[in-house]
Amino acid sequence: MVTIRADEISNIIRERIEQYNREVKIVNTGTVLQVGDGIARIHGLDEVMAGELVEFEEGTIGIALNLESNNVGVVLMGDGLMIQEGSSVKATGKIAQIPVSEAYLGRVINALAKPIDGWGEISASESRLIESPAPGIISRRSVYEPLQTGLIAIDSMIPIGRGQRELIFGDRQTGKTAVATDTILNQQGQNVICVYVAIGQKASSVAQVVTTFQERGAMEYTIVVAETADSPATLQYLAPYTGAALAEYFMYRERHTLIIYDDLSKQAQAYRQMSLLLRRPPGREAYPGDVFYLHSRLLERAAKSSSQLGEGSMTALPIVETQSGDVSAYIPTNVISITDGQIFLSADLFNAGIRPAINVGISVSRVGSAAQIKAMKQVAGKSKLELAQFAELEAFAQFASDLDKATQNQLARGQRLRELLKQSQSAPLTVAEQISTIYTGTNGYLDSLEIGQVRKFLVELRTYLKTNKPQFQEIISSTKTFTEEAETLLKDAIQDQMERFRLQEQL
């Protein structure tokens, strides 16, 4: 028979009493009233804050967006198919944040910063809020360094600086993504971290962009944030903020970053869907009243940091899709008014074979020549005006039967200038190559060539300069000015190449 020892029992009871935790844990909970279309209505959650994360019984996370008198409207970060009516929901006391680290470079992630490329987990010790306040006036300095896109039309006439926000907009299939991806390819060796945010696109389009980056070695310095067309509206709405948080992480570590939002029209549509399902009152084009704030708080996070903060920068290139070239629609005008300039891609120019299809008349950079090196200012200063005058003259010349010699010469020069701005996709040019190309056109060296020969001649000239006159590239890179020595080298190269080119054409 087992003997019961009173002292052992009393010791056990004493230990249990000492281990007893008198803390009371108060959890803010609620009950699901209804769920569907990515929206849940919750009764309870009395002390929940706007934008707070809530957790459902089966693990789905949501964001409390609508705080009404008798219920809370929550948008779901998932399909929510397992959420049942009457199940419990608890407030987490947190707002959306993501892990950040250098390990994200070269990876493809979703809006929650989870990898979707099948290469395993990403280690991160720090985290950043998805929505963080933009730098203030004192934290910034004016834009003064160029961010080279590698596209002659942009770098010479619509220059972009580090810390600038430049809108790229146009109809579908006009090469908006191509301009953005070419800019990323051109950052190779420039010590710029790139973030490409794909919002609501086809998975095949995103895969194509990622493949291009991998083939050209651009993934080494690029992070791709992707939420495809089949993702919940909540995640499409959050994706740009996730990209901005990652870019900010590098900016505040005194690095230069470039972020591309492709495209903000889809984000606005996702936000409109969420708002209408939450029964918020619709405004113009059925968008909610705060759709301007949706984009302004995102784009204001792009900045050029002050000297005290290490002069890091975050350059934003948002993309917006227009319908039938309507520049005055709601979202395009909103984003135009937020950004420091815009690049308009025209469907008519694209179909006419002018690619990149940049409409120089409507496009503008509000930073201007502050974002150009001195050499580019010296060579390309008048090219935008000349092209604008040519476009006007060309329209007029269609109605005139006989034109004087000066007008004919101006038209011929304009046609050749337009020809030298044409560029193949994924073929960015260095600054020295751009300067040599523009100088050749604006100084009349191409006037004697047929229009069809211009591009072939320029390609050969750039190759000739690289192999026979490497000093030209060195002078531009080191001094950043178009010196007399550089001009002499370039003139000699043009004359030598012109003679060789004419001999080749005669054979």
Curated annotation (Swiss-Prot):
Any one cellular-component term (Gene Ontology): chloroplast thylakoid membrane
Enzyme Commission no: 7.1.2.2
Domain of life where this protein originates: Eukaryota
Location, primary (coarse class): plastid
GO MF term set: ADP binding; ATP binding; proton-transporting ATP synthase activity, rotational mechanism
Swiss-Prot/TrEMBL site (Required for activity) positions: 363
Catalytic activity from the UniProt record: ATP + H2O + 4 H(+)(in) = ADP + phosphate + 5 H(+)(out)
Binding-site list for ATP: 170-177
Entry's localization field: Plastid, Chloroplast thylakoid membrane
EC category name: translocase
Pfam families xref list: ATP-synt_ab (PF00006), ATP-synt_ab_C (PF00306), ATP-synt_ab_N (PF02874)
Alphabetical UniProt keywords: ATP synthesis, ATP-binding, CF(1), Chloroplast, Hydrogen ion transport, Ion transport, Membrane, Nucleotide-binding, Plastid, Thylakoid, Translocase, Transport
Membrane topology summary: Peripheral membrane protein
Family matches, as InterPro entries: ATP_synth_asu-like_sf (IPR023366), ATP_synth_asu_C (IPR000793), ATP_synth_asu_C_sf (IPR038376), ATP_synth_F1_a_nt-bd_dom (IPR033732), ATP_synth_F1_asu (IPR005294), ATPase_a/bsu_AS (IPR020003), ATPase_F1/V1/A1_a/bsu_N (IPR004100), ATPase_F1/V1/A1_a/bsu_N_sf (IPR036121)
Function as written in the Swiss-Prot or TrEMBL entry: Produces ATP from ADP in the presence of a proton gradient across the membrane. The alpha chain is a regulatory subunit.
Family the entry assigns: Belongs to the ATPase alpha/beta chains family.
Subunit-level organization: F-type ATPases have 2 components, CF(1) - the catalytic core - and CF(0) - the membrane proton channel. CF(1) has five subunits: alpha(3), beta(3), gamma(1), delta(1), epsilon(1). CF(0) has four main subunits: a, b, b' and c.
Record protein name field: ATP synthase subunit alpha, chloroplastic
Organism for this UniProt entry: Gossypium barbadense (Sea Island cotton)
Lineage: Eukaryota, Viridiplantae, Streptophyta, Embryophyta, Tracheophyta
